Amino acid sequence: MSLWVPPPKPPTKLGVYRRLSTTAGVHVSPLQLGAGSIGDKWSKFMGSMDKESSFKLLDAYFDAGGNFIDTANSYQDETSEKFIGEWAEARGIRDQLFIATKFSFDYKRGDNTVTQHILYMGNSHKSMHLSVKASLEKLRTTYIDLLYLHCWDFETSIEEVMRSLHTLVLSGKVLYLGISNTPAWVVSQANQYARDHALTPFVIYQGAWNVMDRDFEREIIPMARYQGMALAPWNALAGGKFRTDAEEERRRITGEQGRKLGPTWERNEKERIVSAALEKVAKEVGTNQVTAVALAYLLHKAPFVFPIIGGRKVEHLLGNIEALDISLSEAQMKELESVVDFDLGFPGRMIGNGSSHGPLMRSAGHLEPPLLLQPHRQSKLN
């Protein structure tokens, strides 16, 4: 009898793990559970969940094979990290999870006992120290798997940021580093500084990206490809605005509505057009989950893509997992991209973005496509 018996078949493809990036060998679920809704302090802003419903969603994700949870020091005025920490401790599964959290924002915004907030904000060594200390306590853990710089502050130097982050890695309090909501040139400079000085570089970039809003593709994706970084799209489902006309009407009738991150919960014309295209492709691939198609689109665009799926309902989570079973044709990808204009801008319009040869190179001869790492091929779980 072999010692190397394969494990049981995972309940869903959340349990078919992928290497995080070419620069990080840890294996994680292909879809992250976004914890922006987990916690009970943001009901007026984007919805919130009590502890029982939070634990139920976390249970559903973990029991489906998921191990990659994304939170932040400031989410739900700190209750997101607190609920996750309490849940993981109660289940005794901390080391089975890959937990990402973030610093930069004022996580004491909702704390009335704090009168001076400036030292809790930004990317300084002081802010970083306070935030990580608090996150470890709230998450009830001795280490953070992935720490993101949440937002570039244009105040703290690259040198201070990278040296301060490296001390956290050396201390064992943080294992991997990520960066979010930051210009591509800053990330490139920061990683080059890290390499030049034997410091820990960033291995993943988190930013806004979906089939409707593709600014991410201009500078961020080419930068990540060159740096060997993974991509973690937030706003992958346009803040919940990708839905069918029938679903929107149902919400209107029942009064359920949806998130109000903008002036209204209802979709605008652009969101309706993209939703219709997603619904058409969904029918072609045999699913009624337009959100799953939107996620599958991102997974088909580049390697090492780990979309963040939020929400508060277990049924929505399970519907989104269907994205891992969807294989989109090149024609379907082009159809989804055709409904909203997208321009690479300068200089991409002139030279391309590295994923294919630009007009200047094509004018000189017939060329084989560039040799690039390809996205994972989606397939059914056997």
Region spans (language model):
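N-terminal binding-site loop/beta-alpha segment at the start of enzyme catalytic domains
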Residues: 1-98, 142, 376-382
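Terminal-tail/helix-coil boundary detector
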Residues: 2-16, 226, 252-285, 300, ...
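Generic structural signal for well-ordered alpha-helices
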Residues: 17, 58, 81, 85, ...
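Active-site beta-loop-alpha junctions enriched in small/polar residues
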Residues: 36-38, 74, 102-106, 149-152, ...
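Aromatic-lined glycan-binding groove of carbohydrate-active enzymes
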Residues: 215-255
